[in-house]
Design a protein with these regions (language model features):
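Beta1/beta-strand and adjacent pyrophosphate-binding region of the FAD-binding site
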Residues: 10-24
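Short beta-strand to alpha-helix junction loop
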Residues: 71-72, 100-108, 145-164, 307-313, ...
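Active-site substrate-recognition segment that forms the wall
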Residues: 30-31, 59, 91-93, 209-335, ...
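Short hydrophobic core segments
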Residues: 17-19, 198-210, 376
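Flavin (FAD/FMN) cofactor-binding core of flavoprotein oxidoreductases
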Residues: 129-132, 152, 301-303, 307-371, ...
Length: 404
């Protein structure tokens, strides 16, 4: 993917420096620029390499369960259909049928109460109805299923759309490795990189799973964790998935709640811990170009460079996905791993970091595609003079992240 970057003024003092050009950084940098701020977006890679690059791109705006999340999901559902036009870029947004599979040794009735809590309750399906929606499913692997409409984008195209619109608004992008922060007394005045020093009135950390270690190296603590997500990506295939397939009993959220609890927070400042055992959520999505991503394994390992047996992981995912979607078991594909940030209370960290003037964070999204675009818009308006109670409630200093 070829991109041209806006002119970078080395001596300029930007209103905002945004660290990280994944989904979070690309969205919030665009919204800040749209609010009239001068913005520098910094990332060590010239194209997406992290969690967004290997995401399914699923937009679960049906899945809000609290008043806050339901409101954000509703805003997201309204925002996405207009986003390609707003950005003047095809982000490949579409709505697909989502099939939530219930395993053959499980009981669909166990999920009816959970469904009633969602903003849009998934509809229960018989096995025959599930196969009508997705013929690639293995009848023997199911005791039932649920369905609802699910948004989807090509993640890399969404980033490219935000970046291109950002540059048209005068935003600048630097490919640089952030090494630390420039300070004047108790206030941050910029960042130190392998390409030099960049100055800014505010620094916004949006580099996902790497945010904690970057801040820790400067003596700053945040309660954000990460998982190692593993999946398999194929080249364009003739196989045609009609739907997005995911398990009804998604285990990743329980892993995040336990691994991100205040009681385990200190472990994340030490390498070598497996905070909770790994899980495997069997799912798959096919993009418009024919490529398929399926998996996924999630591991709560505190070392971002932890050694993982890729061959065994790939076999485990192929076996699991091959049971539910047999045609995918032996397709050509490559194992990938990325780091996925999260917070134990399933809400992101947004706002100023206490004790360090000029330093802010926008990170830790557990369900990013569903809630991030409206929060990026709200945050940019909030820091541009339009106070927002929702942004205030997502402070990195909020009580739900602390031991009681």
């Amino acid at each position: 993917m070829t991109r041209t970057y806006a002119f970078l003024e080395m001596g300029m003092v930007y209103d905002w420096i945004v660290i990280g050009n994944g989904l979070t950084g690309s969205a919030v940098s665009y919204e800040l620029a749209a609010n009239g701020q001068t913005v520098l977006l910094v990332d060590r890679h010239g194209s997406p390499q992290g969690a967004t690059r290997f995401s399914y791109g699923g937009i679960a705006y049906w899945s809000g369960t609290t008043p806050l999340l339901k409101q954000l999901c509703q805003e997201s559902q309204e925002q996405y259909p207009q986003l390609s036009a707003e950005l003047d870029y095809d982000i490949q947004f579409r709505e697909l049928d989502l099939v939530l599979t219930v395993a053959d040794d499980d009981d669909p009735a166990a999920y009816t109460d959970r469904c009633s809590q969602y903003l849009v309750a998934p509809t229960q399906l018989s096995i025959d109805e599930a196969l009508d929606l997705e013929p690639m499913l293995n009848r023997s692997a199911l005791s039932g299923a649920f369905t609802t409409k699910h948004g989807n984008v090509k993640p890399e195209e969404l980033i490219a759309g935000y970046n291109n619109a950002f540059k048209r608004l005068g935003g600048a992008i630097a490919i640089a490795q952030v090494k630390g922060f420039q300070r004047q007394g108790d206030r941050l005045t910029g960042i130190l990189t392998d390409q030099g020093t960049f100055s800014g009135a505010n620094v916004l950390v949006s580099n996902g799973a790497l945010a904690r270690s970057l801040l820790r190296d400067s003596g700053i603590h945040i309660s954000q964790c990460f998982s190692h997500a593993e999946l398999i990506e194929t080249p364009p295939l003739e196989h045609q998935l009609r739907t997005i397939v995911m398990p009804m009993n998604i285990q990743r959220f329980a892993l995040e709640a336990t691994a991100g609890a205040p009681e385990t927070d200190a472990l994340w400042d030490e390498d070598g811990h497996e905070v909770v055992p790994p899980i495997l959520d069997t799912g798959a999505v096919q993009f418009l170009d024919g490529t398929i991503r399926f998996g996924q394994i999630s591991r709560a390992l505190t070392d971002p460079d932890a050694v993982i047996d890729a061959a065994q992981s790939e076999q485990d995912m192929r076996d699991a996905v091959g049971y539910v979607l047999p045609e995918l078991k032996d397709v050509t594909g490559t194992w990938h791993r990325c780091l996925v940030s999260f917070c134990g209370d399933r809400l992101p960290l947004i706002g100023p970091i206490p004790s360090t003037d000029g330093l802010h964070i926008f990170s830790g999204f557990s369900n990013p595609f569903a809630i991030l675009p409206p929060l990026a818009k709200r945050y940019a308006a909030h820091v541009s003079g339009d106070p927002d109670d929702i942004i205030t409630r997502l402070s990195p200093d909020r009580p739900s992240l602390k031991l009681t």
